[in-house]
Amino acid sequence: MISELKEIELEDIAIICNYINEEARSNGVITDPFVVSSNIEFLIRDRYNGAYKIEDDGVIVAFIIYERQYHENTLAHFYVEPRYRTYRSVMIPLTSKLVEEFKGKRLNYKKLHSKVDAITHYANNGEIDVEGLEEFVNRIKR
């Protein structure tokens, strides 16, 4: 059963890092697992940032991690396992959370994992079109 949007816990870091490192490897990029783990842990420990997951029967299938800063907001990671990208119960909570947090604000991005259309369609030159994303969310909620 697919869970609601939940905060990522410190014990989830290894699993999330495995997703990131595996995807990098499949794209021919070599990563340092320690560096990836340290970066994710830093983002998650700072509760001013946001780190959320969705699980299916206790297994993480999607996550978002974003940084809130005084001068800039950044979507650090947006990942949805491929077979869950058409699930409304996964996509609506993830995209709604971004709209809720960043409506009327600028949202940059670092890495959009595996071209998740719901986000990449609204991404251009390092910035997410939050208004366009909100229209998308409203459309798929119906």
Model regions and ranges:
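A short helix-loop-beta-strand connector motif used in the catalytic cores of GNAT acetyltransferases and
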Residues: E41-K53, T74
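Conserved GNAT-fold acetyl-CoA-binding loop/helix
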Residues: N21-I40
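Conserved acetyl-CoA binding element of GNAT-fold acetyltransferases
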Residues: H71-R83
